[in-house]
């Protein structure tokens, strides 16, 4: 089964992120949840983003790369919200990842390298009415998602009919158990 590095969102390594990791692990996988904030968590996304800006996104990226180096056995990298950035970066610049899972966020295919790694599966989960996704992530992901007309595109994009950014985190008001169950099932299918 897969070894996965899962990066948390802007609120930090919340109990809800840990719970999601346990749900993913229930498929027989090992999920590592590095703490990019050194134990700090935040009540609102705005507070968490302010902390991330204080640390600097380059520093968050470096911490993510160090976490990947600590878990060299991992073959899958994943991120939620802000955590998509270090996951995406690792998938593009560290050889050996067979999959990248992006939840509540997406980046340009060439964000950290000229081309997406052809051997790295890309699975994206976004809310269709999520204000954060509507700032560009959803449109960006749709531009390279596989469709009936373009089956050769690199990403599998799953769109959820919700305005909740962190619907997969049970410790937030955004949590939706039904959508989370669908998301986890799709991740298990990818990793099977």
Q: What are the residue ranges of the model-derived segments?
A:
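Serine-hydrolase catalytic machinery in alpha/beta-hydrolase-like enzymes
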Residues: 1-72, 167-171
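Conserved strand-to-loop "acid loop" that flanks and positions the catalytic carboxylate
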Residues: 9, 123-132
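Short beta-strand immediately N-terminal to the catalytic nucleophile in serine-hydrolase-like folds
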Residues: 77-79, 103
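Short beta-strand/loop motif that positions the catalytic acidic residue
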Residues: 118, 124-126, 160
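Conserved alpha/beta-hydrolase "acid-adjacent" motif
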Residues: 131-140
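C-terminal catalytic histidine-bearing segment of alpha/beta-hydrolase fold enzymes
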Residues: 151-192
């Amino acid at each position: 089964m897969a070894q996965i590095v899962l990066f948390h969102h802007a609120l930090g390594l919340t109990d809800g992120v840990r719970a999601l990791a346990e749900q993913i692990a229930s498929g027989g996988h090992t999920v590592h949840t590095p703490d990019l904030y050194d134990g700090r968590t935040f009540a609102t996304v705005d507070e968490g983003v302010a902390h991330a800006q204080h640390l600097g996104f380059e520093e968050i990226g470096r911490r993510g790369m160090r976490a990947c180096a600590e878990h060299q056995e991992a073959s899958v990298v994943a991120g939620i919200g802000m955590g998509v950035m270090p996951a995406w970066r690792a998938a593009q610049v560290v050889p050996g990842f067979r999959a990248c899972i992006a939840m509540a966020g997406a980046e340009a295919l060439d964000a950290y390298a000229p081309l997406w790694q052809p051997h790295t599966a890309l699975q994206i989960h976004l809310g269709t009415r999520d204000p954060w996704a509507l700032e560009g992530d959803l449109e960006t992901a749709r531009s390279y998602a596989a469709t009936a007309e373009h089956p050769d595109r690199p990403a599998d994009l799953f769109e959820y009919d919700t305005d909740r950014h962190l619907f997969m985190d049970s410790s937030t008001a955004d949590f939706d158990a039904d959508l989370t169950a669908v998301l986890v099932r799709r991740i298990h299918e990818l990793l099977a």
